[in-house]
């Protein structure tokens, strides 16, 4: 999905100011928003990539004018309505229209539930990787309407495989259908001038984690030269 959340390489937004001794939460409501996301996630109606995709639907002007945890709250509200856990009217009025049809975790169950969260690794689910360290690859020119982890600035670019991180759930399909499709994930090194042109520093490089379906051999027959 080409949205305002994918800001890499865009101009005009000013510097990223690092806050010294930054707290985990700046306001009490942010901690509540974070806890609500975790608690609702334990209901099993969506996964982490669906959560990211929900936040990506925030209108661009609203996205730029709001904070990190406001994005989280927007995505949660959207999912609660989409999954019929609340109605749009209940969200608008902030009043329940009836008893909830879900069973919430008890405080005593929370530590166990957090410990039991499963990692996205699927190393036992796929054969040998298609690429290895040192291989030249080209990212595909993908512009899906659904979720993807391939940033716009790194599409249709040539890089070199630095390492294979292993096999993980492919976020794209996980967000769109919930299917757990295994895919190798590689750290790919892109030279700065490959991404940004002649204005980039000659010693600059960017490492992007790319899933195997995003990549193809750079030296395939008929590929444009680099």
Stretches found by the model and what they are:
Residues 47, 87, 106-107, 127, ...:
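Short, solvent-exposed coil/turn linker segments
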């Amino acid at each position: 999905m080409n949205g305002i959340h994918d800001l890499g390489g865009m101009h005009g937004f000013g510097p990223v100011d690092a806050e010294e001794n930054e707290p985990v939460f700046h306001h009490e409501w942010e901690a509540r928003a974070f806890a609500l996301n975790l608690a609702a996630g334990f209901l099993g109606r969506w996964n982490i990539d669906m959560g990211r995709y929900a936040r990506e639907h925030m209108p661009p002007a609203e996205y730029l004018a709001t904070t990190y945890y406001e994005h989280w709250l927007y995505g949660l509200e959207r999912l609660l309505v989409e999954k019929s856990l609340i109605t749009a009217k209940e969200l608008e009025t902030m009043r329940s229209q009836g008893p909830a049809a879900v069973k919430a975790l008890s405080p005593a169950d929370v530590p166990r539930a957090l410990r039991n969260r499963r990692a996205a690794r699927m190393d036992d689910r796929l054969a040998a990787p298609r690429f290895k360290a040192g291989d030249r690859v080209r990212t595909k020119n993908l512009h899906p309407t659904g979720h993807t982890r391939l940033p716009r600035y790194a599409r249709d670019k040539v890089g070199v495989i630095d390492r294979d991180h292993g096999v993980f759930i492919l976020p794209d399909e996980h967000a769109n259908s919930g299917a757990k499709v295994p895919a190798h994930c590689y750290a790919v090194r892109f030279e700065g001038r490959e991404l940004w042109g002649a204005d980039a520093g000659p010693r600059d490089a960017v490492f992007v984690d790319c899933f195997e379906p995003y990549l193809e051999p750079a030296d395939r027959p008929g590929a444009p030269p680099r």
